[in-house]
Amino acid sequence: MVQLDSKLDEATTAFYEGRSGNIPLAWTITFVILAGMFLVFFLYHRFILPRPASDNATVHAEGENLFSEFFATFKSFFTKENIGPALAFLLLFRLGESQIVKLASPFMLDAREVGGLGLTTGDVGLIYGTIGILALTLGGILGGLVASKHGLKFWLWPMAFAMNLPNLVFVYLSYTTPQSMWLISASVAVEQFGYGFGFTAYMLYMIYFAAGNHKTAHYAICTGLMALGMMIPGMISGWIQEIVGYENFFIWVVICTIPGFIVLKFLKIDPTFGIKKSPLNPPKGE
């Protein structure tokens, strides 16, 4: 059975490729390997991660006290100083990226006649699953290294630009629809590297804002808000794309990065936060 794309409004062509092999077995082997890798990672972190003396439970509650402590933890989070700018940052900093991440793969898989790049699932797997992951990891490592030298506040704006400006590569890809795998892969690598570098600022700010009493619970709340900031815009991204098309959608995504820049002006961050402490190079103010 062949199903045509409802978005096609002119004649098109299609190519079919027959493949043999046990596809269910291939998927099974893939997930068994992944499960084994996660087990290795678990064992590594179980025995390698440090256990500082300060890492102890600070609250011991049972029964009714447990519920009162639960709500007290939320209350203490939402009454923190500068909670307004912090919430805005957590929800808006990735407003553009939260929409791109939902539509990047459909954009690459959709036919060229409907504005996509017409790639195969194998192509997309290579671009995002290999090249993109490597670029993302390298960007994150570099972000951590530079933040340890000058601190979060120093790198906040550069990291914001690094996360958001590379979204322009999707505007370019949607307007030119190149066929070169090298060009598409390089574009995705740039975008993912910038995202990894910029996301360092997001993670560091969550750690910074969660500091104090109930810091573990407060960090968990921050991660929940992080997920909310990705989920809600992502829910409507497909609807927006169907209305305006890929070209205008990616322009819209770039516009959506503006609120994330605006909120940076209202964040209050200790200039020494994030700087790696060393007897030879102590943070400023110590």
Where do the PLM segments sit?
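Short amphipathic helix-loop junctions that connect adjacent transmembrane helices
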Residues: 93, 102-124
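C-terminal ends and interior cores of transmembrane alpha-helices
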Residues: 161-179
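Hydrophobic core of transmembrane alpha-helices in multi-pass small-molecule transporters
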Residues: 92, 179-201
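Loop-to-transmembrane helix entry/capping segments in MFS-fold secondary transporters
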Residues: 121-122, 212-222
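Intracellular loop-helix junctions on the cytosolic face of multi-pass helical membrane proteins
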Residues: 1-99, 148, 262-286
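Intracellular juxtamembrane helix-capping segments at the cytosolic ends
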Residues: 104, 197-211
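Interfacial helix-cap and linker-helix signal at transmembrane-aqueous boundaries
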Residues: 1-9, 109, 146-147, 238-245
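Helix-to-loop junctions at the C-terminal end of transmembrane segments
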Residues: 138-155, 241-242
